[in-house]
């Protein structure tokens, strides 16, 4: 597992965007052979999205032959609701780039049969040959997507009941009223993410420091979803300095030494 440590959020956002763009350009996607990209919502990837939008505008990267799959969606929230993840993605990314609408795939939290919706989502991913790069963020407890602590490390896309901590944390998007926050969501599973050819997780802020320590210095533990990345053959964590405060000095020095030639990844 790789750990890229940059100074601040702006720096890790730029690095992450450059990495996504580099992978797409290396693949040279076509209509018949698109690049398959997994994407997250939340505050962590917003900076990356802004950088990718700018790169798209100046012609550094195109999303014309990119197919996307998002990580999760609330259950029972209309897709046009301002806090739905569908709205988030179109407002913060898709509407600003040259991606084809038919190439955007998102879970439907209002499907009549939620179990079938999850199964069909998994099958759709498989029909494209799997996800080439899955980008994600984490919560303070190390969860990825809505794979809360205790999630099976082999879990697939499914319906999940949200923990009270997650509901309280997300209430800031719902007028700080926990009664307005959906109580469940559809989410890709840990196994779904781990099946991707490459996984890149963005970690920023001192409140993620404990989770990063569990990801890097502790063993694999289903109570810390991010620790599963230790088992992936091609995983990258991109972290700002604030999130490294609970790592040992030697750990930080080690990763800085081996990654120093990769800090500038401009394309």
Curated annotation (Swiss-Prot):
Site (Part of the allosteric site): 151, 158, 160-161, 254
CDD domains the UniProt entry points to: GlcN6P_deaminase (cd01399)
Recorded metabolic or biological pathway in which this protein acts: Amino-sugar metabolism; N-acetylneuraminate degradation; D-fructose 6-phosphate from N-acetylneuraminate: step 5/5
GO cellular component, one term: cytoplasm
Domain of life from the UniProt record: Bacteria
EC nos: 3.5.99.6
Listed GO biological process terms: carbohydrate metabolic process; glucosamine catabolic process; N-acetylglucosamine catabolic process; N-acetylneuraminate catabolic process
Reaction(s) the record says it catalyses: alpha-D-glucosamine 6-phosphate + H2O = beta-D-fructose 6-phosphate + NH4(+)
PROSITE patterns the record matches: GLC_GALNAC_ISOMERASE
Gene3D superfamilies registered for this protein in UniProt: 3.40.50.1360
GO molecular function, one term: identical protein binding
Keywords for the protein's UniProt record, in alphabetical order: Allosteric enzyme, Carbohydrate metabolism, Hydrolase
Residues annotated as catalytic: 72, 141, 143, 148
Enzyme class: hydrolase
Control of this protein's activity: Allosterically activated by N-acetylglucosamine 6-phosphate (GlcNAc6P).
PANTHER family: GLUCOSAMINE-6-PHOSPHATE ISOMERASE (PTHR11280:SF5)
Family membership noted in the UniProt record: Belongs to the glucosamine/galactosamine-6-phosphate isomerase family. NagB subfamily.
Function: Catalyzes the reversible isomerization-deamination of glucosamine 6-phosphate (GlcN6P) to form fructose 6-phosphate (Fru6P) and ammonium ion.
Cited HAMAP family: GlcN6P_deamin
Protein name stated in the entry: Glucosamine-6-phosphate deaminase
Organismal lineage: Bacteria, Pseudomonadati, Spirochaetota, Spirochaetia, Spirochaetales
């Amino acid at each position: 597992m790789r750990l890229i440590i940059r100074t601040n959020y702006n720096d890790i956002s730029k690095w992450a965007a450059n990495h996504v763009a580099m992978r797409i350009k290396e693949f040279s996607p076509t209509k018949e052979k698109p690049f398959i990209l997994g994407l997250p919502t939340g505050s962590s990837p917003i900076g990356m999205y802004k950088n990718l939008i700018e790169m798209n505008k100046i012609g550094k990267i195109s999303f014309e032959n990119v197919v996307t799959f998002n990580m999760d969606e609330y259950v029972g929230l209309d897709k046009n609701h301002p806090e739905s993840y569908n709205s988030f993605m179109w407002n913060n990314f898709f509407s600003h780039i040259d991606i084809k609408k038919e190439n955007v795939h998102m879970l439907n939290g209002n499907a009549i049969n939620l179990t079938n919706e999850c199964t069909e989502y998994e099958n759709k991913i498989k029909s494209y040959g799997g996800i080439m790069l899955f980008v994600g963020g984490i919560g303070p407890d190390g969860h990825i997507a809505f794979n809360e602590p205790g999630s099976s490390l082999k879990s697939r896309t499914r319906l999940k009941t949200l923990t009270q901590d997650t509901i309280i944390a997300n209430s800031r998007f719902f007028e700080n009223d926990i009664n307005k926050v959906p109580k469940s969501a559809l989410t890709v599973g840990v196994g779904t993410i781990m099946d991707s050819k490459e996984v890149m997780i963005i970690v920023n802020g001192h409140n993620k420091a404990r989770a990063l320590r569990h990801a890097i210095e502790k063993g694999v533990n289903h109570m810390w979803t991010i620790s599963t990345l230790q088992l992936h053959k091609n995983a990258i964590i991109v972290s700002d300095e604030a999130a490294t405060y609970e790592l040992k000095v030697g750990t930080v020095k080690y990763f800085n030494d081996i990654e120093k030639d990769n800090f500038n990844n401009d394309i």
